[in-house]
Amino acid sequence: MKVIFMKDVRGKGKRGEIKNVPDGYAQNFLIKRGLAKEANQSAMSQLNAERKAEQRREAEELAEAKDLQKRLEDDKTVVEIVAKAGEDSRLFGSIPSKQIVQALDKQYNLKLDKRKVELPEPIRSLGFTNVPVKLHADVTAKIRVHVVAKQQ
């Protein structure tokens, strides 16, 4: 019997796969527990519609990520952060990704998740720093961060 898996079943199939399984296994285990449903015409057309919707959603996310990448990598987009610094232009403390995201939201009204900022270690010195941001699996942007000493 051909079935469409609704959930991942270890050793048998992943969600959305169409496979041939023994009739008894399909009726008594998979279908009864909601792990799969019979692969008839209506179920197949529903699966195809879900796949098309998923592809459309993926394309929209990619387009949004590319648009955001253009806005972030624009020459005018420089995130300025004011911090206390010593004489040797080293900061008292550091600037983590959370602070960069908050400054970006405050200055340019661009909301980002702090986990997308790929900062290997917090910024500890004054000046310009290019910070990579993973917007999508295929799209990575660079934010220019300018750390300025706080006037006393």
Swiss-Prot record:
Function: Binds to the 23S rRNA.
One Gene Ontology cellular component: ribosome
GO molecular function, one term: structural constituent of ribosome
NCBIfam families referenced in this protein's UniProt entry, alphabetically: L9 (TIGR00158)
Family indicated by similarity: Belongs to the bacterial ribosomal protein bL9 family.
Pfam families in alphabetical order: Ribosomal_L9_C, Ribosomal_L9_N
Protein's name in the database: Large ribosomal subunit protein bL9
Stored HAMAP family: Ribosomal_bL9
Keywords: Ribonucleoprotein, Ribosomal protein, RNA-binding, rRNA-binding
InterPro entries xref list: Ribosomal_bL9, Ribosomal_bL9/RNase_H1_N, Ribosomal_bL9_bac/chp, Ribosomal_bL9_C, Ribosomal_bL9_C_sf, Ribosomal_bL9_N, Ribosomal_bL9_N_sf
Stretch forming the signal peptide: none
A single GO BP: translation
Family matches, as PROSITE patterns: RIBOSOMAL_L9 (PS00651)
Location of the region described as Disordered in the Swiss-Prot/TrEMBL record: 41-61
Biased composition (Basic and acidic residues): 49-61
